[in-house]
Each structure stands twice: as C-alpha cells, then as structure tokens.
C-alpha cells in the first residue's frame, strides 16, 4: 500500500513535510518505521518470513512485526496497528517497551533508497504461536526460535542470506535486550 509518510531530517526530526512512501523510497528521504520484537519468558523470539512478493528482501526472516508510520500517526499507534494487521494480535500501547531508534539506509537500486528511522519495541508474546493469524500479502510464515539460536544466526551472521541484513549492531541490541528480560 502506498501511504503518505512524514519526512524526517538527518537528525530524525520531522520536517513538516510528507509524501507517498514510494516517493520517499525513490528519493531516499528519511521516514519513520516501527519494529516490534516479540519474545517469550522462556527466551524464544518470534520471527517472520517476509512475503514472497515484497519489494525488499522477499522470503528472508525478519523482525516479528514491522511497518511504516503513516503521516501524522503516533509511533505507538502505528506499532499497535501493524501488530494487528500482520499477526492478528491486539495489543495495548502499554505492552510496548521502547528500545529507542535505529537509523538504516539501504540502496536497493538506483531508484529505491530505503532510508528509515526504525522505532524499536519489545513486547512479550502472551499467546501461543498457533493463535496468531498472518497477513498473507505481507508475511509468509512465523516461527518461534530460541534466543541462543537467533543470536548465533544473526550476531555472527552465520546464516547470511537467511535474515534481512540489518547488521550486527542492530541484532546485538535486540538480543541483549531480550536476554535481559528472560
């Protein structure tokens, strides 16, 4: 869906301008997104396999839930909305624990520069995996993996080509945060 997104300056502050997501990607304009990482008290991480028709990183494993923040939308509202859309789970804003932001710029092609400020949240998964309902156009599959396996596969990037390449610093931040809560 080509929604309007707010444009941010290099420091992540709103410029007061917005445009279609496709234009932001074409021009490499920084815009906000949300990443929500679900975990269980037993130390398992919920990951999603991106849909096969996604423009970027199709069929790679990624953050539990992710999406763009619509123009004028509150960050936590976008996070809650994306969770409900992608995995069919209704959560409250108080369920979200902010880990801060992470700036990422990826040149996908000459006319697609993905410049995003990820607002990262943790959320404890309170239902069994089989109670989640995937949004098939966005998500191919869901899996709960042990944190140690997830760390092994992303920290050292031992499984290059399996996960979206967010980079070791990003993954280390997520892994350490989840580990301290389980």
PLM feature segments, named:
Residues 1-35, 39-41:
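Acidic, metal-coordinating catalytic segment for phosphate/diphosphate chemistry
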Residues 23-34, 44-81, 85:
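Conserved Nudix-box catalytic region and its N-terminal flanking loop in Nudix hydrolases
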Residues 7, 38, 47, 122-123, ...:
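Conserved hydrophobic "DFG−1" position in protein kinase catalytic cores
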Residues 90-100:
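A short coil-to-beta-strand element that immediately follows conserved catalytic motifs
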Residues 83-89, 102-106:
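Extended, positively charged loop/linker patches that create polyanion-binding surfaces
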Residues 3, 32-34, 41, 65, ...:
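Residues that flank catalytic or metal-binding motifs in active/ligand-binding sites
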Residues 22, 59, 71, 98-108, ...:
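Nudix hydrolase/Nudix homology domain
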């Amino acid at each position: 869906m080509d929604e309007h997104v707010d444009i941010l300056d290099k420091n992540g502050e709103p410029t007061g301008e917005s445009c279609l997501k496709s234009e932001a990607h074409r021009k490499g304009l920084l815009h906000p997104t949300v990443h929500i990482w679900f975990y269980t008290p037993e130390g398992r991480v919920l990951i999603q396999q991106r849909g096969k028709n996604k423009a970027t990183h199709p069929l790679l494993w990624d953050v539990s839930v992710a999406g763009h923040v619509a123009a004028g939308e509150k960050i936590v509202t976008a996070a809650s909305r994306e969770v409900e859309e992608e995995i069919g789970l209704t959560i409250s804003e108080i369920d979200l624990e902010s880990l801060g932001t992470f700036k990422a710029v990826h040149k996908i092609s000459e006319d697609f520069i993905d410049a995003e400020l990820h607002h990262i949240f943790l959320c404890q998964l309170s239902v069994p995996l089989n109670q989640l309902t995937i949004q098939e156009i966005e998500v191919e599959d869901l899996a709960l993996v042990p944190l140690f396996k997830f760390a092994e596969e992303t920290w050292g990037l031992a499984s290059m080509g399996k996960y979206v390449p967010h980079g070791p610093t990003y993954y280390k931040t997520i892994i350490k945060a989840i580990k301290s809560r389980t």
